[in-house]
Amino acid sequence: FRRVLFRSRIQNGRCTGVETSRGFIAARKVGCAVAGSSSRVMQAAGMRLPIESHVLQAFVSEGLKPIIPGVITYGGGHFYISQSDKGGLVFGGDIDMYNSYAQRGNLPVVEDVCEGGMTLMPMIGRARMVRMWGGIMDMSMDGSPIIDRTHIDGLYFNGGWCYGGFKATPASGWGFAHLLATDTPHETATAYRMDRFERGYMIDEKGSGAQPNQH
C-alpha cells in the first residue's frame, strides 16, 4: 500500500487532494506531518516555511547488562541516553549545525557527543559502537512547533518539532486531530500558529533567539 507523495493539488486556492505514485487521492482536508521533509513537501504547495532541515545523529553500542532503567538527559552537555531491550546504549546529542537532507553526519559531532556521554558516565567510554545514523530534524526558528491551518483552504500543517518530534507524538497527534476535525486549534495549541513569526510572538522558551541551530 506504499505510495510516494508528489504534490498537493491546489485548485482556486483550495487543496483538493494529493498526487501520488499510484494516482490522485481526493480529500476535503489534507494534513501535512512529515518532520524533516516539511519544507520540501510544503514547497510543492507553494509555501515557504519558517523551518530549516538539520541532521541529528544517533548512536547504538554493543549489548550490555542493564544499567539504565529509563532515559537520562544531560542539559549541560546536550546529551541523552537510554538502553534498548537488547542491551545496546542508544544516545545522541546536538545537531550537525548545517542545513542538510543527508541522513549521515560528520565526525566532529561524533566526538562531541561521545565526550558529553563520558562526562556524564565515564564507564561508557569502554563500550564499542555498532551503529550510527542521521535523521532529519525540522528545526523551527524559535524551537517551538507549528500546528495550524495554512492560507490554502483544506491544507493543514503540523511540524517544527525540532528534536522532540518522536517524544511529542501523542500530544502532537491529539492536537492536530482536533484542528482537522473542528477547524479550531486545541486549547493547548493555540499559541503554535504559523503567523507568530510575522506578528513577533515567537515562543522562545530557551531565550536563544530566532536561529534554528541554537535550539
Task: Annotate each predicted stretch with a short phrase.
Residues 1-5:
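Short, small-residue-biased leader/transition segments that mark boundaries at the very start
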Residues 6-7, 20-22:
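Glycine-rich, Trp-frequent "lid" loop and neighboring beta-strands that shape
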Residues 76, 118-215:
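C-terminal catalytic lobe of FAD-dependent flavoproteins
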